[in-house]
């Protein structure tokens, strides 16, 4: 029984250590991708659904970057301030069209409505990189 307990503890520690290494590798890839301004694209779309920082946008241009994604996509707005959007609004947004894991929402790091900037690129990018450093390291 004692050997079994030691084996279970060993396997649990090994599993947890493996998860930590996996997160560190993911964080490194995310930081590399999100740090390079060349990976960002600015798109235009229509707000379909909005809840706090989560937004679903209809964007036909997204298919040019993600062939497997349909024109409706989930995004997360990386703003420290509440951004008010209305369903049906036409918005211009900057994102990195790349999914790192299943369920990952594409980041919005810049947001404009009629040339009115609601989230600047610099602020949004900084918030996104901070989020990666906090959640994946």
Regions found by a protein language model. Name each.
Residues 21-40:
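Short boundary/loop segments of OB/S1/cold-shock single-stranded nucleic-acid-binding domains
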Residues 60-62, 96-98:
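Solvent-exposed coil/turn segments that connect beta secondary-structure elements
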Residues 97-134:
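OB-fold/S1-family single-stranded nucleic acid-binding modules
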Residues 15-18:
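C-terminal motif of bacterial Sec signal peptides marking the signal peptidase cleavage site
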Residues 34-57, 61:
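Structural detector for short beta-strands of small beta-barrel domains
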Residues 1-5:
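Positively charged n-region of N-terminal signal peptides that target proteins for export
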Residues 63-78:
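A short macromolecule-binding patch
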Residues 79-94:
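Short nucleic-acid-contacting surface segments enriched for D/E, G, S/T with interspersed K/R
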């Amino acid at each position: 029984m004692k050997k079994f307990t030691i084996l279970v503890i060993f396997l649990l520690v090994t599993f947890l250590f493996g998860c930590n290494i996996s997160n560190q590798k993911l964080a490194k890839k995310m930081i590399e991708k999100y740090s390079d301004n060349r990976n960002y694209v600015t798109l235009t779309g229509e707000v379909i659904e909005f809840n706090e920082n989560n937004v679903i946008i209809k964007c036909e241009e997204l298919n040019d970057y993600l062939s497997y994604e349909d024109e409706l996509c989930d995004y997360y707005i990386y703003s420290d301030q509440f951004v008010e959007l209305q369903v049906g609004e036409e918005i211009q947004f900057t994102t990195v069209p790349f999914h790192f894991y299943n369920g990952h929402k594409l980041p919005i790091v810049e947001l404009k409505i009629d040339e009115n900037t609601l989230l600047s690129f610099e602020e949004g990018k900084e918030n996104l990189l901070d989020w990666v450093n906090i959640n994946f390291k």
